Amino acid sequence: MKVGKSYTLAEFLAWTRRKIYVLLVMAIIPVVLYKVFGQTWIAAPWSVAVLLGTATSFIVGFKNAQTYNRTLEAQQVWTAIAGTSRYWGLICRDFPTHRASAKVLIHRHLAWLTALRYQLRGSGRIWETVSSRSNQEYLKTYSVPEKETTLEVELQKFLPESELQRLASTRNKASTLMSMQSEAIRELYARQELVVLHHTEMQKTLKDFLDQQSKVERIKNFPYPRQYATINTFFVWSFAALLPFCMVREFDRLNDAVSGVFVGNMVWLTVPFAVLVSWMYVSLDQVGESSENPFEGGANDVPIAQICRWVEIELRETLQETDLPRLLSPRNQVIL
């Protein structure tokens, strides 16, 4: 998540520069054909650019709205996880008759948060864009906590060796930890450390956590529909390719209104203006593409590592622990 005021124009230009190079070539070719080789027949009617540009605007706007909704939903689910975690800390402290049980339950919950965020960020999907050259280049300017330490090292802070060994052979470690929580609550109830009402409430809270886990896993595992993403790319690049052909004749007509060295050369203005207009569409498409997957480790991700750190500090304060970790610090105004 970007925590600065805004991205700078220099960052945007550097991030999109490879596409700018392509747009530049696409704009120069029709101008050279028109001006140097005299192929004036290649000029297309301006109405073609208007119609295609309008259609492209609608589909790009639709895509960006939908990808923003995915990020917003991810943020809302993690906000719910944080709120339910605070409640979990309170009932673990107050419901069991022996306070020692609270520490075990809370630390296992912190392990669940850790396993969940590693599952979301630790494994990529083929449709994710963080592996693109532009995103990989920008990735060097900020930190992804899940790439700096392994899950096993993080889990050692919260779990005994026996539980770590049990987790080692499981595929979905977050779900396994929820299963272990349910078993622990059942044992507390069997030992009469929980009354029926408290046992029921704790099981209900575990169900809430499982529901929230399923929601973020759905966002992770179900991409923005590929048919919409594909047609969006076709529209954007078709518009970028045709725009210079529609502009050359319009700029050539400006020769009648100028004098001196500009006479006969106004058509070359097609290149910068075509690149500028096309770049706006291509950049909007790239922004939407980079926002599709809020758990891939991109600069616009939901800051799940920071949310987990907030929850960890608060829950360990509930246990009156004093050796607390610090909040994560942003790097290059990005925090994840």
Task: Give a label for each model feature.
Residues 42, 71, 95-103, 195-199, ...:
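Short, surface-exposed loop/turn segments at secondary-structure junctions
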Residues 231-250, 275, 279:
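Bilayer-spanning, highly hydrophobic alpha-helical transmembrane segments
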Residues 93-193:
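Long amphipathic alpha-helical segments that form oligomerization/scaffold cores
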Residues 1-85, 94-98, 256, 262, ...:
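N-terminal juxtamembrane/topogenic regions of multi-pass membrane proteins
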Residues 2-15, 194-197, 209-234, 296, ...:
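Membrane-interface, cytosolic juxtamembrane amphipathic helix immediately N-terminal to a transmembrane helix
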Residues 109, 176-188, 197-220:
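Cytosol/matrix-facing amphipathic helices and coiled-coil assembly/linker segments
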Residues 274-278, 289-302:
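A hydrophobic, small-residue-rich beta->alpha segment in the mid-to-C-terminal subdomain
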Residues 89-92, 113-120, 124, 185, ...:
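A structural signal for well-ordered alpha-helices, especially hydrophobic packing surfaces
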